[in-house]
C-alpha cells in the first residue's frame, strides 16, 4: 500500500490525496470481485481495514473527499447477463463493528445524534447476519412482479423467473398487504442442502462446490430456472424498500408482519433495550453458530422505532441507525506442503501456500495467500515483526484463517511442530515463468524497499503478456465478448502468424490476417462459424471507445478505472493526454505540475504514468493500437441541482433546529463536503450562537458566512 501504512494523522495533504486515489481503485476492484464475480481475493477483515483507512483519511482531510469515494459507494456494477432493474429505493450496505467496544460506541452514538433522551429509552433489534445474497421482492396488487439482486445498490439484476422457483417465497400476499411493497432479505443455501449437493456431485465424479454462499449466488444466476429450482435455495425477510402503506411503526413490527404474510423470518431476532443486552444476544448467537443450518458472519443491530430511523437518516452508503457486528475470523491447523509463485500483470511475484486439505468454517481449504516475501519472513509492511518474527517454512504446521468467502491466509506457525533441520524459504530472484531477474524496487519517494518482488521481463514474460491481454479485454477496459481467459491463452500460444495475438493491436488485425489464411479459425475445435462471426463483431464494435476505458486498458501501473476517468476528464482527448505525459517526462515544468495538481493523482501515480510513456516498447504498442481504434473525447461532468454540491461547509457554534450530526448529514446528502476547520478552501461557514475563532477566521479570509435560518433557506429546509 502507498505511504507504507504511515499513520493517517502523519500524512501530508498530498500523501492523503494520493492514498485516497489508490484506495478508490483498490476498493472498487475488490467490490467487483466480491459482488459482481463472486470471486473475492482478500479477506473481509483486510477489505474492512482498507475501508476504515479510507474513512479515517477523509475524516482528517474532508476537502479531499472524492466524488467516486468508496464511502459513497455500495457494491459492484450488475452483470449484463440479466436485465437491469432500477431499485425504487437504494439497497444500502451496513457499516461494520468488530468488537464489543465498537458496539457500545454504536449505541452511544445513536443517543448523541438524537440528543437528550433517557438511557434505555431506545429499543434495538438484533438478528443474525446471513451470509447469502441480498434480494428485493416487489409486489404490486399483492402479486410478485419483480425480484432483483442488490447489484451496485442502485441497479440490480432481474432474477424473477429464478426466484419463482423458491417455494418458501410467496407468489401472492394476503388481502391486508399494501398495494405496493418491496420485501427485502437474504437468499441462502442451507448447510445440509449444500452437503447433499456436493455428495451428489462427488457421486457423479464432478468438481465440488466451494461454499454455500457462492453456490447460492451461482444458482440464482442460472439462465435456466430449472437449475435454480433444483438447488433448494431459501430466504429470510428482514427489510423493505418502496411501500405504499406502512403496516407497523417499528422494525420488529415490520418483520412480524412479513411473518404473517408468509415470509420466513429469523427466529433468533430479538428486541432489546441496551448495549449490554445486545452484546449478550450477540455472544449467544456466536455460541449457537456452529449448530445453525445456515452460514452467518455476525449480528445486525437496528434502531427499532421507524420515526427514530428517519431522524437518524443515512450516510452516503449506509443507514446511520444500523450496524453489523462481525464475528472473528475462523481458524484451523494444517501442514504447509509447498509454496507456488504466481506472476501477475505488473510482474508481481505472489507466493501461494499449498496445504494439506483442511476444513475451515465448513469449507475445504487447499491453498492460502502468503502475500509477499517479507510476510513469509515474518516482517510487516512497515518493517515491523509479525507473528513475533516467526518465519514460515515448508513442512510447518500452520494456523489458517478464513474470514469470508476469500482465499484464506496463514496467520501463524506452530513452532513446536517444526521439523528439525527445516530450511528457511528462499524466495526466487528470477521469474519462474520467463527466467528474467525479479527485483524489489526502491520507492524513490520514501527510500524504502518495495514489499513486492517483480519480474523485469515485461512483455518478454509470457505470464505478464497474457495478463496484460486479459486486462485489456476485461469488462471495464475494452470489454470484448468472446475473448475470455481461455481464448486469450489459445491465441497467445498459437504459432500460426494468422492466429497469434501477442499484443493488444493484434486483436484488431485478427480478422484481416484470417482472410488471407488457409487455417480458418472457424475450423478449430472450440470455435465455429457463428462464434467466430460474433467474435469479429465484438472486436469491431470496440474500434471506437471511451477515453477513460482506453487509458485504463493500457494497464499502466497504479492507474485503475477511477484514475483513468480522472485523467480523461482532465485532458479531454487522448492526443492532449499523450502529449502532456511525454512533456512531463522530465518530472518538472508545467505538464508535470498540471498532472500532479489533478485531485486524486499523487506523485506515485504520476511517476508511473510518465514512466509508461518513456518506454519505447509501450509507445510502439500504443501507436499500433491507434491505427486500429479511436478513443472518443471525454464527456464533461454533469452538474447537480443542489446549491451546495461540491462546496466545503463548516458548522460552528450552537445549532438550535437540528443537532450538529443531523446538519452534517443533510449537507453531505446534498453533495457538500463538511470540514472541521476553516481554510482558503472553505466555501460556507454556518455560524450559530457562541461561534468563535472559526467565524473570525472566515471573515478574515472572506469566506461566505450565514446563520442557521439562512442555511436552511439556502438548502430548502
Swiss-Prot record:
Family that this chain belongs to: Belongs to the NAD-dependent DNA ligase family. LigA subfamily.
Key word DNA damage present: yes
GO cellular component terms given for this protein: cytosol
Annotated organism of origin: Sinorhizobium fredii (strain NBRC 101917 / NGR234)
Organism ancestry: Bacteria, Pseudomonadati, Pseudomonadota, Alphaproteobacteria, Hyphomicrobiales
Gene Ontology biological process terms, A to Z: DNA repair; DNA replication
Domain BRCT, first and last residues per copy: 639-717
Superkingdom per UniProt: Bacteria
Name this polypeptide is given: DNA ligase
Amino acid at each position: 500500500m502507498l505511504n507504507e501504512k504511515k499513520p493517517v494523522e502523519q500524512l501530508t495533504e498530498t500523501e492523503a490525496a494520493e492514498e485516497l486515489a489508490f484506495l478508490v481503485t483498490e476498493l472498487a476492484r475488490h467490490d467487483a470481485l466480491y459482488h459482481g464475480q463472486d470471486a473475492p481475493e482478500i479477506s473481509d477483515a483486510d477489505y474492512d481495514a482498507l475501508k476504515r483507512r479510507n474513512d479515517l483519511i477523509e475524516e482528517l482531510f474532508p476537502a479531499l473527499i472524492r466524488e467516486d469515494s468508496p464511502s459513497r459507494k455500495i457494491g459492484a456494477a450488475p452483470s449484463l447477463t440479466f436485465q437491469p432493474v432500477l431499485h425504487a429505493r437504494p439497497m444500502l450496505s451496513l457499516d461494520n463493528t468488530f468488537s464489543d467496544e465498537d458496539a457500545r460506541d454504536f449505541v452511544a452514538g445513536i443517543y448523541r445524534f438524537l440528543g437528550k433522551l433517557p438511557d434505555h429509552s431506545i429499543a434495538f433489534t438484533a438478528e443474525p447476519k446471513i451470509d447469502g445474497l441480498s434480494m428485493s421482492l416487489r409486489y404490486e396488487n399483492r402479486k410478485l412482479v419483480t425480484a432483483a439482486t442488490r447489484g451496485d445498490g442502485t441497479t440490480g439484476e432481474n432474477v424473477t423467473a429464478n426466484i419463482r422457483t423458491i417455494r418458501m417465497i410467496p407468489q401472492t400476499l394476503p388481502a391486508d398487504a399494501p398495494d405496493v411493497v418491496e420485501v427485502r432479505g437474504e437468499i441462502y443455501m442451507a448447510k445440509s442442502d449444500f452437503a447433499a449437493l456436493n455428495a451428489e456431485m462427488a457421486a457423479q465424479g464432478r468438481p465440488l462446490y466451494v461454499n454455500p454462499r457462492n453456490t447460492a449466488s451461482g444458482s440464482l444466476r442460472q439462465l435456466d430456472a430449472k437449475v435454480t429450482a433444483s438447488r433448494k435455495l431459501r430466504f429470510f425477510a428482514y427489510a423493505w424498500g418502496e411501500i405504499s402503506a406502512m403496516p407497523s411503526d417499528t422494525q420488529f413490527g415490520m418483520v412480524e408482519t412479513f411473518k404473517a404474510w408468509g415470509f420466513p423470518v429469523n427466529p433468533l431476532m430479538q428486541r432489546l433495550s441496551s448495549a449490554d443486552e445486545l452484546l449478550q444476544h450477540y455472544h449467544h448467537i456466536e455460541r449457537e453458530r456452529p449448530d445453525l443450518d445456515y452460514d452467518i458472519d455476525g449480528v445486525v443491530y437496528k434502531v427499532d422505532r421507524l420515526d427514530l430511523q428517519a431522524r437518524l437518516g443515512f450516510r452516503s452508503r449506509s443507514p446511520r441507525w444500523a450496524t453489523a457486528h462481525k464475528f472473528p475470523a475462523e481458524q484451523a491447523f494444517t501442514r504447509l506442503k509447498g509454496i507456488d509463485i504466481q506472476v501477475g500483470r505488473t510482474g508481481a511475484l505472489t507466493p501461494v501456500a499449498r496445504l494439506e486439505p483442511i476444513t475451515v468454517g465448513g469449507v475445504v481449504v487447499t491453498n492460502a495467500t502468503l502475500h509477499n516475501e517479507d510476510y513469509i519472513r515474518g516482517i510487516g509492511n512497515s518493517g515491523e515483526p509479525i507473528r513475533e518474527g516467526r518465519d514460515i517454512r515448508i513442512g510447518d504446521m500452520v494456523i489458517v484463517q478464513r474470514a469470508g468467502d476469500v482465499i484464506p491466509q496463514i496467520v501463524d506457525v506452530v513452532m513446536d511442530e517444526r521439523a528439525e533441520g527445516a530450511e528457511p524459504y528462499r524466495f526466487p530472484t528470477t521469474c519462474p515463468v520467463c527466467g528474467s531477474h525479479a527485483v524489489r524496487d526502491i520507492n524513490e519517494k520514501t527510500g524504502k524497499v518495495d514489499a513486492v518482488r517483480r519480474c523485469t521481463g515485461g512483455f518478454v514474460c509470457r505470464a505478464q503478456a497474457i495478463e496484460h491481454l486479459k486486462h485489456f479485454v476485461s469488462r471495464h477496459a475494452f470489454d470484448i465478448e468472446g475473448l475470455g481467459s481461455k481464448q486469450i491463452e489459445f491465441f497467445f500460444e498459437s504459432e500460426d502468424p494468422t492466429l497469434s495475438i501477442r499484443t493488444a493491436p493484434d486483436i484488431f488485425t485478427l480478422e484481416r490476417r484470417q482472410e488471407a489464411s488457409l487455417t480458418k479459425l472457424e475450423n478449430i475445435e472450440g470455435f465455429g462459424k457463428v462464434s467466430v462471426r460474433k467474435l469479429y463483431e465484438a472486436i469491431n464494435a470496440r474500434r471506437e471507445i471511451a477515453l477513460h476505458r482506453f487509458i485504463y486498458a493500457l494497464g499502466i501501473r497504479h492507474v485503475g478505472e477511477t484514475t483513468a476517468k480522472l485523467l480523461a476528464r482532465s485532458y479531454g482527448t487522448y492526443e492532449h493526454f499523450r502529449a502532456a505525459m511525454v512533456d512531463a517526462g522530465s518530472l518538472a515544468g508545467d505538464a508535470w505540475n498540471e498532472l500532479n495538481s489533478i485531485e486524486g493523482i499523487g506523485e506515485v501515480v504520476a511517476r508511473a504514468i510518465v514512466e509508461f510513456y518513456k518506454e519505447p516498447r509501450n509507445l510502439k504498442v500504443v501507436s499500433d493500437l491507434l491505427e486500429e481504434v479511436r478513443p472518443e473525447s471525454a464527456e464533461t461532468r454533469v452538474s447537480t441541482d443542489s446549491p451546495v454540491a461540491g462546496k466545503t461547509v463548516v458548522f460552528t457554534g450552537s445549532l438550535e433546529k437540528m443537532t450538529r450530526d443531523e446538519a452534517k448529514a443533510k449537507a453531505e446528502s446534498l453533495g457538500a463536503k463538511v470540514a472541521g476547520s476553516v481554510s482558503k478552501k472553505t466555501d460556507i461557514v454556518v455560524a450559530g450562537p457562541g461561534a468563535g475563532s472559526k467565524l473570525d477566521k472566515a471573515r478574515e479570509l472572506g469566506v461566505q458566512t450565514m446563520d442557521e435560518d439562512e442555511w436552511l433557506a439556502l438548502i430548502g429546509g
